[in-house]
Structures are given as structure tokens and as C-alpha cells.
């Protein structure tokens, strides 16, 4: 899958989640990390206007509404692999982190589906000029895309490189014909080892350090297995190449991993086709610190059916839970960015070659007293 198709797939699902970087299982086709949703990370970029990650007030200011998720057997959030216990998706959270409260944000970028909104044209122009300077480009007046009376996208090109800035803070750098890496680097979607991928990311982090300005670049070498329907095919591991800034405290690292990160896309010839920099909190409003539940309490909520999911199966056997992690969902269409415990549960779907599909189930991490509509899947079955 080349970077253009990869980008289109991401845009269609966005985001996501992963979430992300976030992986989806749809007709056995691997789609990219989506902003969670998602994509899914988190740094103060050189070209990014930061958002106050800490609330103005310690007390929660509003009851929270949990969104619904469409359930579709043909496409749902999942991870496919052999042993989920060995899968590292790069999430910096771990159970030893002693959070009692976490911030919640109102998403100012997507009041509804469609083109991103949020930043002013002037703020977008600042990002465009800073990105061009970091890349050593001289640009003329950019092309604009409008949604009603608002400019929602700026585009400028020079010498085979195109920079796109969107009103939600996302920056894309497209390389016409692909940008070749030095011969010693092996940069592919599905034929690169972890060691080779780490070497590629080390190189890219240094090459684009002026653009990213990460104090402590952290690599995400995640991916999942995919099995083609073609006769005689063998599983292939589709990976993603992601960096985020891990120079902050635990909370900042989690937010950077989820909302602000850089992702690199190879083309079919192993050249760099696209560099995308996410900034999901650029237009977010911090609405307060909310008390959260523990992992054990989240397990109880999962067992009682208090979760949201796109998976068309209920959780009926807790022994099938393979992994749990604390995440923020960051899809552009999320009205509120709040923390969840994401559980990966082995599904009854049959897979060839020993592969197992694990569906993703989200339990709100905020205490129930602050949730206006606690989900109850079993109550709504059918």
C-alpha cells in the first residue's frame, strides 16, 4: 500500500485512533493507526502552538457524555497477531502510574464531520512558514480551501515538496516521487524488522529534527499481522513508523503519544512519501480534572457491560481478555477527549496460521458519578 492510499485510508477512518497511532481489522485489510479514537501523541512541535495541558480549575466543571460506537461485523477496531502479551504498541502508560485524576478536553476542531476547523488562517500561515523554514523551502502565497467563510486548509509547494496545513493543526509534507533514504536503511510497510525500523526512525528523527523539535524522540514500532485471502499466502507484518516527544512527565507523555506525534510513510519503492505531524490538542479546551477508576474497577465495569465498542460481539468471558491499557480517544469527530481503559478481548473469529483477532472495548476511566449516560451494552443487546 503506497502512502497516498495509506493516507486516504486514514482520512476515511479518522481518526484514528488511534488512536491510535490504532489499527483496524476490516475485510482482512490492514488500515493505519488512527487518532483515537485513536491517533492516537504529543509533543510541543517547532511548528505547533501548544495547548495548556493542565486545567484552569481542579474541580470537574460538567457531566460527561459518552459517545456511541457503530458496530459493524465488516469493519471494527481490533489487533491481529499471535501473542498479544508480547505486543508493544508504544503506549507509555503502565499500571504503576499513580493517577487519581486526569484532564478532560473539549475538542474545538470538529464540531461536526467534515473539513477540520479550529485555527485561524493567520495561525495556519504561521505553521506553514515555520515548517517551510525548517525544511529549507521558499514558498509563495499558499492555496486555500474554505468551508463556508472560514479557511480550513493551506497548501504550498516548492521543488517537489508540498506542505499542507489543516485548521486542526495537522501538518503534512508530501514528497513528489518519494524521497530516497541512504542505501543502508530498509524502509517498507511490511518487510522491515524491528531493528531496521528503529534504524530508520533514528535517521528520520535526526534529519527532521528542526521540523519536529522533539527534546526526547521516542519510537513507536507497532503494527499487526495481516493475512491475504489469496491462495497460498502467508501472514505479513504491517508496521507503522511513529515518533513522539517523551521529554515530559507521565501525563504529558501519554497525551503526546495520543495527540501529537509524527508519522512517516514509505512508498512501494521504500522512499519517504509522506510525513504527517498530528496536533490533536491544538484547538482543545481543558475543562477540568476528573477522578478516575482503577484498572480493577474497570475490569468490573467491563464484565457488567459498561463499555463502548465497534466490535459486533459482547464480552461474555473475562478469561478472553488479553490486554488492558489507559488511553485517550482522539478521533476528530470526538466531541470530548477523555480517558478510557481499552481492553483487547480475543474474538471467536477463525484465523489461519495461528493468528487471533482481539477486539477493542472501551470502559470510561472517569468515575461514574461524572458520567451522564454510562453505557450498558448488555442492557441494550439486540
List PLM regions with ranges.
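Disordered, charged N-terminal biogenesis/targeting segments of membrane/secreted proteins
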Residues: 1-30
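Single-pass transmembrane signal-anchor helices and their membrane-water interface zones
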Residues: 10, 35-61
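Short, flexible helical or helix-coil boundary motifs
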Residues: 17, 135, 139, 306-309
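A eukaryote-biased signal for long
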Residues: 95, 122, 126-131, 135-142, ...
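Segments that shape or occlude catalytic/ligand-binding pockets
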Residues: 199-341, 345-352
